[in-house]
Regions:
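Bacterial N-terminal signal peptides that target proteins for export
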Residues: 1-8
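Catalytic His-Asp segment of secreted/periplasmic serine-dependent ester chemistry enzymes
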Residues: 192-291
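Active-site segments of SGNH/GDSL-like serine hydrolases
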Residues: 137-138, 148, 175-213
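Oxyanion-hole/transition-state-stabilizing segment in secreted/luminal serine hydrolases
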Residues: 53-55, 107-165, 194
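Bacterial signal peptide processing site
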Residues: 20-24
């Protein structure tokens, strides 16, 4: 943990003088995906998924890890079949997307090393032509943990709705920052699976799973709202492949090699087509009875 925090702190201190601030409130058109033969400057924002935790060859944070079997290096290798690819992997294990959730997590004793806006966004290279963002699952778990510790008081739904809106505002900031830092990048945002349907939650109480589901669907809708605002959405929530039992590591939370390979293939298909859409509703949004 000390080493991880030191790495994150070092990267942040190096970036303070190198990175500009702020984003634009405009709504840009979505840049085109890289052509099948053009060089790709790929930047990945994420958490332990970006490092391939749960795979047979996980990666040390902040390395290109060419032989890794997480979705980031697998996608990079897939794209290299037809073009040159430069990879910058900014994923920080256990990070959350939202600084609001980061603060809540620390308030309730959860060890969260970073959020995407403070510790990943400042390092996005301006020449990025492809960016993937996968955040939200750790945010869901951190908020559910806060609920378990009494954060919601007597108004559970009111508390959850407030945090979902705050996540949406933080997502706005992240997307605006990405568009400002890398205006030519084709951005793919992966939405949040229904965490109540993942194996790690199978032994939880019904109410705990209902909270996970409510948060997962709420955060996914906030991410989906960004579709067409200069990016496209990869729909993990409504893709049955996301929940395939054979795609998970032994912890029931992270994908294994099969799960990561499937995600990499879906992302490669989006890069190839230049388009993607997310469903407004699907059966996977109600894996357990609604809260």
């Amino acid at each position: 943990m000390t080493i991880r925090r030191a790495l994150v702190g070092l990267m942040w201190s190096l970036a303070v003088t190198a990175c500009g601030g702020g984003g634009s409130s405009s709504t840009p058109s979505t840049p085109a995906a890289p052509s099948p033969v053009s060089a790709v400057h790929y930047t990945a924002l994420g958490a332990s998924d970006a490092s391939g935790v749960g795979s047979s060859v996980p990666c040390v944070p902040f390395t290109t890890c060419d032989a890794g079997t997480g979705y980031v290096p697998v996608l990079a290798r897939t794209l290299r079949a037809t073009r040159d690819v430069t990879l910058v992997n900014l994923g920080i294990p256990a990070a959350v997307l939202s600084p609001t959730v980061y603060d809540i997590g620390h308030r309730y004793g959860r060890d969260i090393p970073a959020d995407f806006i403070a510790r990943e966004l400042p390092f996005v290279p301006s020449d990025s032509t492809l960016i993937t963002v996968f955040g939200g699952p750790n945010d869901v778990n951190a908020l559910a943990d806060a609920v378990e510790k009494g954060a919601a008081g007597s108004d559970l739904r009111g508390y959850l709705d407030t945090q979902i809106r705050a996540f949406g505002s933080d997502t706005d900031r992240l997307v605006q920052g990405l568009r400002s830092r890398a205006p030519s990048a084709f951005i793919i945002v992966i939405n949040v699976p229904n965490m109540a349907g993942l194996p790690y939650a199978s032994g939880y109480s019904l109410q705990a799973r209902q909270v996970l589901q409510y948060l997962s669907v709420g955060l996914t809708r906030e991410l989906n709202r960004q579709n067409g605002r200069g990016l496209v959405i990869a729909d993990a929530m409504c893709d049955p492949q996301t929940y395939a039992p054979g795609g998970f590591a032994s912890d029931g939370f992270h994908p294994n090699d099969t799960g990561y390979a499937g995600l990499a293939q879906r992302l490669a298909s989006i890069v190839a087509s230049g388009t993607s859409s997310a469903s407004a509703s699907c059966a996977q949004m109600t894996i357990v009875p609604p809260l």
